[in-house]
Regions:
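Long, contiguous binding/interaction regions
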Residues: 1-81
Length: 81
């Protein structure tokens, strides 16, 4: 068994309203920045024990589906470091 570091990035799917990003976009434009697009995402750093890298990825994927992301509105990317 080894210890694995992972990162999970969770963001809203295309077409889902992102009020946080819209507020930030308007504020940055008021500060003089010309933006075409901005999207907010969350980064989760997870350290866990697992039998293998594949087992770690399986566990992190399960955690993400069960709690970190709502598959109806979120997309996510998992990386085992």
């Amino acid at each position: 068994m080894g210890t694995y570091d992972s990162e999970v990035i969770v963001g809203l799917k295309d077409g889902v309203l992102d009020p946080e990003a819209e507020t930030i976009k308007r504020s940055l434009e008021r500060l003089g920045y010309d933006l075409q697009f901005i999207k907010s995402k969350k980064l989760f750093e997870i350290k866990l024990d697992a039998e293998s890298k594949e087992d770690a990825e399986k566990k992190v994927n399960e955690m993400t589906k069960r709690l970190l992301a709502n598959p109806t509105i979120h997309e996510y990317k998992i990386e085992i470091l």
